[in-house]
């Protein structure tokens, strides 16, 4: 009689756990200093609402004098990417701190790490809300140790292209409606939004627009959201990530930048297109290596989303000398989802 040796159900479960631990150790160095970007342990949950702990481990909270003002994205063990408008020139870096590993901003957790800021590099072309160059690099005072709750997101290379219609996720701790703060304990919020082409976004922003105050969608901007409105970013999340999934990894496709009201119809959220600044990022931080983004799907034509005529004249708008005006976004954009479904 042949002797058959097999594993019981409990042994198989134990083996699976060991394999999972081994996989995580291969992605997180023994000293916690290395981790592959854009990988998460939590399964993806579509839609909107509160995220789960560790679901977006690159999301950080940027505080000014102890108050949350903006979001940001961890891209290495010592660098964070955020929006330039989060750091007015008159503010000192000593007044900022970066909170990593947080889920509920108002709750204490051993997973949370707070670092002071050693350096802030804002893009030189940034001038005001809605202008080009709304991106900043923040160097932490010391390297952070990666964990299940603290991990970097992938930076896209300069030639990266994210297709129209791709469903990405914007995250943050901002307002849930205009002038309505997220309630204690302020859990991290997530909202899935489809990407919209620059041409269609410009067309939408021309609907009911004030001619003297054009909303110009620049070449370094990316739009995402819903034509009917109701779900968007709002005050409190500027600088946070627009994370897009490509071939099993998450990429920092956009940085929450500006918008015209929160969740208004025909006004999708506008983000800084991170890939535009891949060379600028590498110039200032040589160790940051943007990744080539695989082209896994074609862009979906979205011209039908805007039937407004005439089509917004982008070239003419760029020639106007009058400043572009938006809502007062001094500490800008946070997740917004009106209760339209109720």
Swiss-Prot record:
Residue span(s) of domain Peptidase S1: 45-286
Main localisation: membrane
Signal sequence residues: 1-29
PROSITE patterns assigned to the protein according to its UniProt record, in alphabetical order: TRYPSIN_DOM, TRYPSIN_HIS, TRYPSIN_SER
Enzyme Commission number(s) from the entry: 3.4.21.-
CDD domains per record: Tryp_SPc
Keyword entries, A-Z: Cell membrane, Disulfide bond, Glycoprotein, Hydrolase, Membrane, Protease, Secreted, Serine protease, Signal, Transmembrane, Transmembrane helix, Zymogen
Localization terms from the record: Cell membrane
An example Gene Ontology molecular-function term: serine-type endopeptidase activity
Disulfide bonds: 37-154, 70-86, 168-244, 201-223, 234-262
Transmembrane stretches, start-end: 320-340
Catalytic site: 85, 134, 238
Membrane topology: Single-pass membrane protein
Pro-peptide region(s): 30-32, 323-342
List of glycosylated residues: 159
Example of a GO biological process term: proteolysis
GO cellular component: external side of plasma membrane; extracellular space; membrane raft; plasma membrane
Purpose of the protein: Possesses a trypsin-like cleavage specificity with a preference for poly-basic substrates. Stimulates epithelial sodium channel (ENaC) activity through activating cleavage of the gamma subunits (SCNN1G).
Subunit architecture: Heterodimer of two chains, light and heavy, held by a disulfide bond.
Family label: Belongs to the peptidase S1 family.
Protein name: Prostasin
Organism: Rattus norvegicus (Rat)
